[in-house]
Amino acid sequence: MSGEVPPNINIKEPRWDQSTFIGRASHFFTVTDPRNILLTNEQLENARKVVHDYRQGIVPAGLTENELWRAKYAYDSAFHPDTGEKMTLIGRMSAQVPMNMTITGCMMTFYRTTPAVLFWQWINQSFNAVVNYTNRSGDAPLTVNELGTAYVSATTGAVATALGLNALTKRVSPLIGRFVPFAAVAAANCINIPLMRQRELKVGIPVTDENGTRLGESTNAAKQAITQVVISRILMAAPGMAIPPFIMNTLEKKAFLKRFPWMSAPIQVTLVGFCLVFATPLCCALFPQKSSMSVTSLEDELQASIQRTHPEIRRVYFNKGL
């Protein structure tokens, strides 16, 4: 529908059915669209005004349904779903493809020497720290100490994994060595994400009923949310770090790259970018953004509270983060 917008559209929810993978994928192809990072502050503020006004029943004259959804997705791409704060530019999901294709491409091109491994793993974990903090679930802030611990631990873990595997793969085929950066990234995700979201594991994340009424905070919900994010992030990195090594291993034996070796990095970055354009939204869509769990899976105290005040509720919902 492209005519004037009706007053009863639920723009708190995505445009597509989130109970299906196709619906979630359509949603995340829009959210992770790199063109969103080109939106100006003025455009984002206009989108926020349209969304906030519509939620309060104020419909600007001439606004169409398509324009409303465009405003909603511009708003969602830049503002945190729980806090409403504008997110750091490079931490937004729309920045994932351009940032990751550059960093990952360079990690996979410059992986043979210790200084190169140290530098690019440090760059990657610095970026990951920003992304993980920006896309955390809930509204509980991290302290400077918690941020520092997560950042140092993840960077150390990634570098140690990369250097250790580099040493082990010196006697095997060069193709195997090309997968070292992926192993380091996978290990770092298992460290970085839980540590960057450690406060959620300590105090819990907000859980609500299906209408969004807050029921309390749950650490069990936080564990489920973080596990799902770790899995999706590792799988998100897999195509861009698993497919290009086979292609580059073949290309580097050809006369063209032997004559122009400086072309390795741009080709690798392009290959990674092509993979990430599809892998990023598809892996974000593996689990619903609005995740849920049975009331019986919550902590005993929270279960008792919900059963006392809302005995009809069987499932609770929460933002799993990205």
From Swiss-Prot:
Subcellular location, principal: mitochondrion
The organism's place on the tree of life at top rank: Eukaryota
Protein localization: Mitochondrion inner membrane
Keyword Mitochondrion included in the entry's annotation: yes
Recorded catalytic activity of this chain's protein: L-serine(in) = L-serine(out); L-alanine(in) = L-alanine(out); L-cysteine(in) = L-cysteine(out)
Coiled coil ranges: none
Cellular component, GO, one term: mitochondrion
One MF term in the entry's GO annotations: L-alanine transmembrane transporter activity
Tissue: Widely expressed, with highest expression in kidney and liver.
UniProt topological domain (Mitochondrial matrix) ranges: 2-102, 168-174, 250-266
Stretches that traverse the bilayer: 103-120, 147-167, 175-195, 229-249, 267-287
InterPro entries: Mtc (IPR004686)
PANTHER family in alphabetical order: SIDEROFLEXIN, SIDEROFLEXIN-1
Full protein name: Sideroflexin-1
Species of origin: Mus musculus (Mouse)
